[in-house]
Amino acid sequence: FTIEDENTDVAKLLENLPLEKVVIYFKLGFLSIDFVMKIDAIAKAKNATIYCNLDPIGQLAKEGNWFKTKKKNNFETLNKLASTTANISLISIDGGLYQNAGANMVQQIAYALSHANEYFNRITTINKPIVFEVSVGTNYFFEIAKLRALRLLFNLVAKEYNHDLDCHLPV
C-alpha cells in the first residue's frame, strides 16, 4: 500500500485482511511517529509481518527535500521509531530510483549500499531487515547477478557494523 497522508485510517484498511498469512508492505510518503506506532500496535495485536519502507535518503534524492517532521530531523525520528517499535521493519532503500535515473548495474549496487551504510551510521538500533526495492531490466542473467552481488555486499557492510541482518529483496 502506498500511503501519502497521515490521516489514513490504517486499522480500517487492514481490518479484513488475513494478516497472519500475508506480508504487508507500506510505502509511506511521510514520516510520523504516531502513525508508525499505530502500525506497530496492529502488527503486535494480529501477529502480522509488516514493512513500513521508510526511506528519508531516497526521499531527499527523489524530491530534493527530507520528509517534513515536527523536529525537522528525519534521523532522530527514525532512531526513536527504531528503538520503540519491535514488531515492524522500518527502513527501506529504493534502488529503483537510481536505475530510473540512468545508473548502470554497478552504480545501482554502489549507491544502494552507500545508502545502507549511511543508515547504519545514523540509526543506532536496526534490528529488522532492511528492504531493498530494486528495479530489474531486460538482461535476465545480469540482473540475477546484480541481486546476488547486492545481497553478498550488503552482508559484508552489515558485518562491519556488527549486524547479522540480511537484506530483504521483495521480487
Regions from the language model: what does each represent?
Residues 1-135, 170:
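Catalytic alpha/beta active-site cores
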Residues 104-109, 138-149:
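Short glycine/threonine-rich loop-to-helix capping motif typified by GTGT followed
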Residues 121-126, 156-164:
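Conserved helix-loop functional segments at active or binding sites
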Residues 165-171:
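Self-splicing inteins and homing endonuclease
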